[in-house]
Design a protein with these regions (language model features):
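Bacterial Sec-pathway N-terminal export signals of envelope proteins
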Residues: 1-37, 43, 195, 201-239, ...
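Sec/SRP-type N-terminal targeting helices
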Residues: 6-12, 25, 69, 80-107, ...
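Short segments within alpha-helical structural elements
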Residues: 26, 168-193, 346-403
């Protein structure tokens, strides 16, 4: 299953969620930046100053600054309190849990699909084995019918009927073999198994019969369902979102430090020979004074979303109860059908043995032998079908109870 592309995608989705959390929490760390600049005045700005020696005369033009300027600046900021970063820290655990639960929910569906595809292949293989046994029996019957025909004990009708029955069984065998190929291909697909590699499957009918039996008196606990757990996590995250909007009136406080190195000169090749550094440290505080009622509207919207999620939770709870009742009802019905088909095999086997013996004694016709053989094969195949339907129902009940394991 680890080779399944969807499983790999789920692992990537979890990884993306973890990275998003780290990105949000990174704002708690100091943010350090550097910048540099170089400037040359093609024409220097000037200031007009009165002539002290001739106050009533024209004003004097005095150049402002120098022709060449350069600066290197280092700045660092540290969030002390910020609502965005604060809520990111509070919700990080729930977002990790949400990603894990989302992945687990999808994995459960994959496991269910793999189990059902696996049992479908086993069912077809067991049916093929029954058909092969029937072919062996029919081949022997055909030889017996031919021998009786050659000896004149029976007419050609019995021989032809035996031939028809054998041909039908051979046709069923071919259909079963081709069906198995398609089902194995589908099983490989849902497993993510390379299609060109052989897939070795083992089955034990007795073990399957034992595994198929479950306690029919147990009740559902929706808290065991990963879908319900995910909804609970979503409710917590939505509540945190409402709290975020409620707290959006709080100020943002951060500390900062700046260090500047300034270079100035009228001659370019002398620019970096002398520097004039300066530095500052301080606190920055910002208050949201008025945002056009956006905060209030966001709170109302978030509360509505929370209420909707609550209703989703209630509806999902009811759906899970219905799903469990339906799955358990199907299981009980399939269990009764399976036990009935077990009895049918015993009866069909007794009928076949009796009819075969009476045919050999000349009491019964060959047609009755064919009918009893067909009934026996049908009873065995029906028993297999009932067993695998019981296994499918077993899986559905376990899924409804939240007991499907994905820890492989």
């Amino acid at each position: 299953m680890h080779n399944q592309p969807l499983v790999k995608q789920l692992n990537l989705d979890e990884g993306i969620a973890r990275q998003n959390i780290r990105i949000a929490l990174a704002d708690w760390l100091p943010q350090v930046n550097a910048s540099a600049g170089l400037q040359h005045y093609l024409k220097q700005p000037v200031f007009l100053f009165p002539d002290i020696s001739n106050p009533t005369g024209p004003k004097i033009l005095i150049p402002n600054g120098v022709l060449y300027n350069s600066n290197i600046q280092f700045s660092a900021t540290q969030n002390i309190f910020n609502n965005d970063v604060y809520i990111a820290g509070r919700t990080a655990g729930n977002y990790r849990l949400q990603a894990s639960q989302t992945s687990r929910s999808a994995l459960i569906e994959i496991v269910v699909e793999i189990n059902k595809a696996f049992y479908d292949v086993l069912l077809s293989r067991e049916q093929l084995n029954i058909i092969k046994e029937e072919i062996d029996r029919l081949s022997k019957s055909l030889k017996d019918a031919y021998a009786l025909y050659q000896s004149g004990t029976s007419d050609v009708i019995d021989y032809k009927r035996a031939t028809i029955s054998l041909n039908n069984a051979l046709s069923q065998k071919k259909n079963a073999e081709e069906s198995i190929k398609a089902k194995i291909s589908y099983l490989k697909q849902v497993m993510g198994y390379p299609n060109e590699k052989p897939l070795n499957l083992s089955s034990n009918i007795l073990s399957m019969e034992k595994d198929a039996i479950i306690d029919t008196l147990q009740n559902i606990n929706v808290y065991n369902r990963i879908e319900y757990q995910l909804l609970q996590t979503n409710l917590k995250l939505q509540k945190s979102k409402t709290d975020y909007y409620r707290m959006s009136f709080l100020p943002s406080l951060s500390a900062f430090a700046n260090y500047n190195i300034i270079y100035q000169n009228d001659v370019y090749n002398q620019l970096f020979k002398s520097s004039y550094p300066n530095s500052t440290i301080g606190l920055s505080l910002s208050f949201p004074i008025f945002e056009g009622t956006k905060r209030i509207q966001n709170i109302k919207k978030s509360k509505m979303q929370y209420e909707r999620l609550t209703l989703d939770t209630l509806n999902t709870r009811n759906e899970m109860n219905t799903q469990f009742v339906s799955a358990m009802a199907s299981y009980k019905s399939d269990l009764a059908a399976y036990r009935m088909t077990q009895q049918n095999i015993e009866i069909a086997q007794d009928v076949y043995n009796t009819v075969k013996l009476q045919y050999n004694q000349g009491i019964k016709t060959y047609l009755e032998v064919i009918v009893s053989e067909t009934d026996l094969m049908s009873a065995r195949i029906n028993n297999l079908n009932a067993l695998f339907m019981l296994m499918f129902s077993n899986i559905d009940v376990k899924r409804a109870l939240g007991e499907i394991s994905v820890d492989y």
